[in-house]
């Protein structure tokens, strides 16, 4: 392979009189194949540049090159853009807009908020409590939030619908402190910080948790990294609602506040390209660059602001840097030869952190003193003057200018990189210290210094009386500053954050819409994945509920048989379809549209869950209930994006999550990474997930109907359904006569009652794709081993477990009350014989109900890694096939003393259940996805 360097050498040595020079590779790696049509003019330009460099030096030469690039951009000359600029503010002083507020008034109550935020965390460390908290994050970002609260963040009563603000999790104390001044929270509630159950009257959650504070918080932003991901997809979903004509979101903006340390999370940056590709100019990231993460510097040897600027600019974002406060303006103006800018460019972040952990004299010597020219710039400044040189993120006007530029910018999302100091204004023991993130308390000396710098009217006596409980400060709702604060919120449409839980009601489809699924498939073999897709296809046809469905697919629509949705529903794309699809002449052509209904996310499960959350919480965010249906390979759901599903539960998302190609043995040939035998276990750990493992199409119909009623009915629940469906086709039976669906929804019902008169009885519990083998095992037991076995369909091991746990918890807490009986116990109480449970999942799945199964209980499952092979071979290996079930039943009967122990031994030998080679050949269709 010819390298770039080799091509460069070839280009230099291949000049000929008959062919103009061609520059193959420019030094920075940007390829160009344009011919040099005037070598003489080119030579003159290069000689002129060399002369300039020699006469004026590199600073002047660099400046002119940058100006030429800027002019080329203005003239729309197609050249590569620079990804990194000098370590100075993006917006020049002369272009800063007029600041519309009263800066003095806003500064005063900003100080009160800082004080109350720190005191709340400090008081939470009082003896007997000690629940932790974070003081320093909000201290560094107070100005960033307050500019937004006073001038940009619009509440839900705003005519445009209001903004969505993702607040950095560790900054929650400051948001509570503001709500205290607004009169939304009391001092008693602040004292309940991180004591949600033990504090009298209830407490406040540690971070933004909507489920724990449903009228206040909107967006959960811990764990770190999920905030930026979800903000991107929230902004995209706002456009989706607008483009489909569901809601006018054109005047709504999404703000996401982040920390520079958080940007190392893969989710923080991994989907930045989506914001650019979608042109999300309704989205602004504000990254608080205090240069510190939890234990130390983010980039001690580097420059995180420069790194993030290059990353986001390269990803197609508009980047605004807010590095220096107004006190630096005069120094930068006097920096005629660029010495100060050069110092700023070359000083690593570790040094900037150290400067703010010292004093003005240290900064004079170790920063300005590194160059005689910069040392001369500050020779008339005192050490205190130097110490008072603020960073940009603490300057109201600089921050306002950046926010105004961000909301006015069109065509791109914007990221604002604001430089701050962690622990700002908290005193010398906090500011810039590596340990500041873990510091929860202030000493008496710290309290007094903090009080003085913030000008809080609290006396020494009040602080000394009980240093564990320094007082909050509130001047009263009639104070001019508080009236000003509340006036600003009224003008902007109400309080932020605020979550509204009431939304418009939906008219659910009638039961007749599910009738086709309850008739069975006749002689046709149909996989439950196909049955599920057909169920939702029927729901989509409903004129009331259909437009509210949001199908979300990570590039597997054809695998799941959903390509038939492309022509009718179309794939959402803000730009429509600007090309001719290769399959345009086919009935099931790939069709994109700006009014498309399908969110086709590509190979991107993380982004798919982001869309699921945005759609599933639209009822609260927009008063527009939507019903997301997210379908994926089950192995790549809760295992890959379980953290996001936990956030979905916190945000109280509603919708359907479909784990397709489920099971450890069903997805033939795909192997270890695809063979899912445990997603139901992972789903069971999420309290908001209602998980089902249906075997038949009619069960799916009842489950979907129940899900719509529970999530979108008169009294909607804050849950989402997880339904595992399979790609193995088999005949779907019709709904039994006089069928009561309660068992389907509660988790278990008897599907097949043995009518044969046999010496012994047994019960087989089966779920999902294990059902056909269970029915065959029952036939074999009756025909060959004198055992009559009932077969039960277990649609939800998890719901049966929760029912049992709830009853036991009630008994523990109230032993004096009559005890309930778990549903599974009641179902099996009159069933004779041992109970054997089988599924295509790990044994731990059916083991969830062991405490409440009467009598002998034996479980079979697919423990261990999956592998590539046929279904019969895999099931023989895991011993979940019909033959293994027969042996398990006989073993249980022998253990109960009902048959001789030699019987299961003989059966095991007869069927060779320990020999994979003895498994039958695969006869069923391998199904899609294999």
From Swiss-Prot:
<keyword id="KW-0560">Oxidoreductase</keyword>
<dbReference type="InterPro" id="IPR041621">
    <property type="entry name" value="PDH_E1_M"/>
</dbReference>
<dbReference type="InterPro" id="IPR055152">
    <property type="entry name" value="Transketolase-like_C_2"/>
</dbReference>
<protein>
    <recommendedName>
        <fullName>Pyruvate dehydrogenase E1 component</fullName>
        <ecNumber>1.2.4.1</ecNumber>
    </recommendedName>
</protein>
<keyword id="KW-0460">Magnesium</keyword>
<comment type="function">
    <text>Component of the pyruvate dehydrogenase (PDH) complex, that catalyzes the overall conversion of pyruvate to acetyl-CoA and CO(2). AceE has reductase activity with pyruvate but does not react with 2-oxoglutarate.</text>
</comment>
<comment type="subunit">
    <text>Homodimer. Part of the PDH complex, consisting of multiple copies of AceE (E1), DlaT (E2) and Lpd (E3).</text>
</comment>
<dbReference type="InterPro" id="IPR035807">
    <property type="entry name" value="PDC_E1_N"/>
</dbReference>
<feature type="region of interest" description="Disordered">
    <location>
        <begin position="1"/>
        <end position="21"/>
    </location>
</feature>
<dbReference type="InterPro" id="IPR004660">
    <property type="entry name" value="PDH_E1"/>
</dbReference>
<feature type="cross-link" description="Isoglutamyl lysine isopeptide (Lys-Gln) (interchain with Q-Cter in protein Pup)">
    <location>
        <position position="375"/>
    </location>
</feature>
<keyword id="KW-1017">Isopeptide bond</keyword>
<dbReference type="GO" id="GO:0005576">
    <property type="term" value="C:extracellular region"/>
</dbReference>
<dbReference type="Pfam" id="PF17831">
    <property type="entry name" value="PDH_E1_M"/>
</dbReference>
<dbReference type="GO" id="GO:0000287">
    <property type="term" value="F:magnesium ion binding"/>
</dbReference>
<keyword id="KW-0832">Ubl conjugation</keyword>
<dbReference type="Pfam" id="PF22613">
    <property type="entry name" value="Transketolase_C_1"/>
</dbReference>
<dbReference type="GO" id="GO:0045254">
    <property type="term" value="C:pyruvate dehydrogenase complex"/>
</dbReference>
<dbReference type="Pfam" id="PF00456">
    <property type="entry name" value="Transketolase_N"/>
</dbReference>
<dbReference type="GO" id="GO:0004739">
    <property type="term" value="F:pyruvate dehydrogenase (acetyl-transferring) activity"/>
</dbReference>
<keyword id="KW-0786">Thiamine pyrophosphate</keyword>
<dbReference type="InterPro" id="IPR029061">
    <property type="entry name" value="THDP-binding"/>
</dbReference>
<dbReference type="GO" id="GO:0009274">
    <property type="term" value="C:peptidoglycan-based cell wall"/>
</dbReference>
<dbReference type="GO" id="GO:0005886">
    <property type="term" value="C:plasma membrane"/>
</dbReference>
<dbReference type="InterPro" id="IPR009014">
    <property type="entry name" value="Transketo_C/PFOR_II"/>
</dbReference>
<dbReference type="InterPro" id="IPR005474">
    <property type="entry name" value="Transketolase_N"/>
</dbReference>
<dbReference type="InterPro" id="IPR051157">
    <property type="entry name" value="PDH/Transketolase"/>
</dbReference>
<feature type="compositionally biased region" description="Basic and acidic residues">
    <location>
        <begin position="1"/>
        <end position="10"/>
    </location>
</feature>
<keyword id="KW-0670">Pyruvate</keyword>
